[in-house]
């Protein structure tokens, strides 16, 4: 063995000894750490038992959701003396009259703001909202919790005043900390039309207080949207376009402290769940106040809320656990031959859109875009000035049609279900369902375009044998709103499809017309 080999062997032995010593030290250190940890835990346990009062220590502290630490969450709402002095019987009556239910895990028990006088806001915002007679139920109940920085789930029908319900507290929080830069308020909405509508309402408030607001959605170039995003504190967006902008690095959501998901159930129906989760991950949960507004409260929406909301207060207006129609809407259902529907439509327009009713707004629903395009041509041929929103039209054409209808340039609007939810079109007097939608739930959302903000309205529906599998569900909705049920509809059967089991198959429940009906529940 050469000298070099002997030296090399010695080096290897030394190296192995060093490694062994390091391992031994690490083992001793780990053992010591475990002992100290055990002693510490034992001392803590003894301390908590002191005074013969045993205190239960949570086993998994890390599983608890972090409490918000943002400026938004640290703002505390102070209830006015005038509101505090109201007798409890007045509050109870208000809850009963408006079918309000509040689930309050924090036991705050904040009273609803029955009048704008009980609300203390910046004078410019106060002046804007005071143009209305009084807060809507969702506003009255949600505002105290939102102004206190709490997470809130609002379950209420479309047209209940949800935009101001989340918009007023959002602007109020912004004004309390005007030094911050970047996007602080983010509202996510399922459709371009609804996003534009929310933007139109919010910009009234942001303009009053010198804040910048922008709206981003697909179907238009991104360049202008990128510019607006850099200047805005308030952003209204559809999930798809916002995610595109995030992935290309054009938007920073790290400063968002007020997040709103509007029409959450609708977004899940449209398959946006993963997009929403990816967007939310770009915000800071520790300083984020989160709001969710939804017309229904199915399992999927509940699960989404549980993943990113912190002890949310749930405010429900109306019978939201079951599918119900607005009782201010007169529902008329006619069973007709499918071949005569368009002829029948012309008769209905003479009834609802001529003479003294010539200037009343009428919204007509078709099921598919091809049907809508055909009906649009037919009505124009018959001399009607009609605007239309359906899939064969460009975004610019759809926006123009909606603006014409809102402004009164055209008082007839033909739409597919793209416009069935969320669009706040004031003073729609009549909804005509030329073709029944694919679900009874969509029917309720369609007719909800009328009878809004305390007004009355009419929904006239043409029902054919092709939709007979939906007859039982429609009967339930009619009965639930105390509306007449035509004999021709009952002839199709009064059962509703309730469940489907992989082994048992579909099974049904008959509607007992002698009793108050059990309304449809969507699991």
UniProtKB/Swiss-Prot annotation:
Region: Disordered, residue numbers: 1-71
Location of this chain's protein in the cell: Nucleus, Nucleolus
Nucleus as UniProt keyword: yes
Positions with biased composition (Basic and acidic residues): 1-21, 49-67
EC assignment: 3.6.4.13
Annotated Helicase ATP-binding domain residues: 143-315
Short motif Q motif, span: 114-140
UniProt short sequence motif DEAD box, positions renumbered to this chain: 262-265
Keywords carried by this UniProt record: ATP-binding, Coiled coil, Helicase, Hydrolase, Nucleotide-binding, Nucleus, Ribosome biogenesis, RNA-binding, rRNA processing
Domain Helicase C-terminal residues, every copy: 344-493
Domain of life: Eukaryota
Comp. bias (Basic residues): 22-48
Catalytic activity reported: ATP + H2O = ADP + phosphate + H(+)
BP term (GO), one: rRNA processing
Role noted for this protein: ATP-dependent RNA helicase required for 60S ribosomal subunit synthesis. Involved in efficient pre-rRNA processing, predominantly at site A3, which is necessary for the normal formation of 25S and 5.8S rRNAs.
Protein name, UniProt field: ATP-dependent RNA helicase DBP3
Organism, scientific name: Saccharomyces cerevisiae (strain YJM789)
Name of the gene this protein is made from: DBP3
